[in-house]
A protein has these predicted regions:
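Carbohydrate-active catalytic/glycan-binding domains of CAZyme proteins
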Residues: 1-257
């Protein structure tokens, strides 16, 4: 084992880590809440970064990567982050309080978000937090089993469990949306694995929850997960797929055939 090295990070609070981008090492961390009057131009509760040519340093302060999320979304709080590279593009994963804001509550509840990181040379440009996020990275393959909780949008539902989870707390009018589904091979049926205590119809449509129905599935009463099939037509090309429920249900997965 090597000798531990202290990184002298100005106004360090928490949430730190090291990433290598190109030939440069980046130490990123959250600043504390007492940064007033500092000589670096940093703000409180923000993600800062330092650079070095060696993972053990010495590190030099580089700038502010991401201000506190309250600057963009209105509710301030601790700032936690991760930097990930996907398909050669860097992304900042962070949390914000947008869901609780929409619910009209203040419990410091955190919801994950992601925005793109851009760079100028070795400088990380300050990331702007948005409610738009990033573009879908690839189309969804409908010809394999897709977990119901893999969705881009939803209304009214919840997800239960860890690992092998299930979409639950579905009631009349609730829906889930799967964006960018590649139906280039077409489809004649969609098979759902779902359950309902009293029976439930599922409208499968495209474009919007009130869009044109391409098929219907009937989930039998009884409360036991089982496969139910919906004959579908008109599914070609890239589609946003909606499952709209007429009543109480749970849904585990779906596949097109």
């Amino acid at each position: 084992a090597g000798t531990p090295v202290t990184i002298e990070a100005p106004y360090l609070f928490e949430d730190s880590g090291i990433n290598k981008i190109g030939d440069t090492y980046y130490y990123t961390y959250c600043s504390n809440w007492n940064t007033s009057g500092n000589s670096y131009g940093m703000t409180s509760g923000a993600i800062e970064y330092m650079t070095a040519s060696n993972p053990l340093g010495p590190y030099t302060y580089g700038g502010e990567l991401f201000p506190n999320q309250g600057k963009f979304f209105g509710l301030y709080g601790n700032n936690h982050h991760s930097i990930c590279a996907v398909n050669g593009q860097l992304y900042l994963f962070y949390h914000n309080r947008s869901v609780e804001k929409a619910m009209g509550i203040e419990g410091n509840y955190r919801s994950p978000q992601v925005d793109q990181i851009t760079m100028t040379g070795t400088k990380i440009n300050t990331v702007t937090g948005t409610m738009k996020g990033i573009a879908q990275q690839k189309s969804v393959n409908p010809y394999v089993k897709n977990p119901a909780e893999m969705m881009s949008d939803q209304a009214g539902i919840n997800v239960r469990g860890l690992g092998d989870t299930v979409v639950t707390e579905i009631d009349k009018g609730d829906w889930i949306k799967v964006s960018g589904v590649d139906f280039s091979k077409g489809a004649s049926q969609i098979v759902l694995t779902a359950s309902s205590k009293s029976g439930c119809a599922v409208k499968i449509c495209t474009g919007s929850p009130t869009g044109k129905a391409v098929g219907y599935a009937e989930i039998p009463a009884g409360g036991k997960l089982s496969e139910v099939s919906a004959a579908v037509q008109g599914l070609t090309g890239n589609q946003d797929l909606y499952f709209v429920f007429s009543g109480q249900a749970e849904m585990d997965c779906w596949i097109a055939k």
